[in-house]
């Protein structure tokens, strides 16, 4: 392996880790193994701390491929709680409002999900990395500032209802770059004349890379010790 020439690695991001923390950990392990102070490492698509699943990490010259990987379609398994919302649209923030769910049926959910397939407009969450006047939306939102984000055009290829167990539903989503599953949860809740927030999210695929192709971050150091590493000459 030659981490300077470039390697592409697949990880299952642990729960509560930021994407940045995963990159830092991998960079630290590689730098230590190679005995170098600097090695270029980056990820090809952020996952929220409360999400797990496929994260592609590129090293060295392979970081030039990050954009290519970002444009691959992604598949998620999402768990939504209906009848309640949070400011972050997930469990990062406490429930701020509750709504009725008595009128919701399985058929209603299935019909509603169909409306989200295809090209749609989605307003990103205020608690997101989108920029507003050069500042990250989540920095403004956490300070309590009003954040107004413009809708983005994106594509949902597939949505499938996997489990229906009110107030919880589980869905599989195949979508394009830039889709916020948290925002999709918000919109599904509204379309059901209720509310919803995300209680669990797993990214199961990025392009052809599946969850079963990924290694655990905690196993990386031991895995690295088993590899034949080419010496880096600056």
Regions found by a protein language model. Give the residues of each.
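Catalytic/RNA-binding core of pseudouridine synthases
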Residues: 1-234
């Amino acid at each position: 392996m030659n981490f300077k020439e470039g390697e592409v690695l697949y990880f299952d991001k642990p729960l509560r880790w930021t994407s940045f923390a995963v990159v830092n950990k991998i960079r630290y392990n590689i730098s230590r193994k190679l005995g170098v102070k600097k090695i270029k490492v980056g990820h090809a698509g952020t996952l929220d701390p409360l999400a797990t699943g496929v994260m592609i990490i590129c090293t060295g010259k392979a970081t030039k491929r990050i954009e290519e990987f970002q444009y691959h379609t992604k598949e998620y398994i999402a768990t939504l709680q209906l009848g309640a919302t949070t400011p972050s649209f997930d469990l990062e923030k406490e429930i701020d409002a509750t709504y009725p769910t008595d009128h919701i049926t399985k058929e209603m959910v299935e019909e509603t999900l169909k409306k989200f397939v295809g090209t749609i407009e989605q307003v990103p969450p205020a608690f997101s990395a989108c920029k507003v006047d050069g500042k990250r939306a989540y920095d403004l939102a956490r300070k309590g500032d009003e954040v107004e984000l413009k809708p983005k055009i994106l594509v949902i290829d597939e949505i499938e209802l996997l489990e229906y167990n009110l107030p919880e539903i589980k869905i599989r989503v195949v979508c394009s770059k830039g889709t916020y599953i948290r925002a999709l949860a918000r919109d599904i809740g509204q379309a059901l004349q209720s509310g919803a927030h995300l209680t669990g999210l797993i990214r199961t695929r990025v392009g052809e890379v599946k969850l079963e192709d990924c290694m655990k971050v905690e196993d990386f150091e031991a895995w690295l010790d088993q590899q034949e590493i080419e010496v880096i000459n600056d």
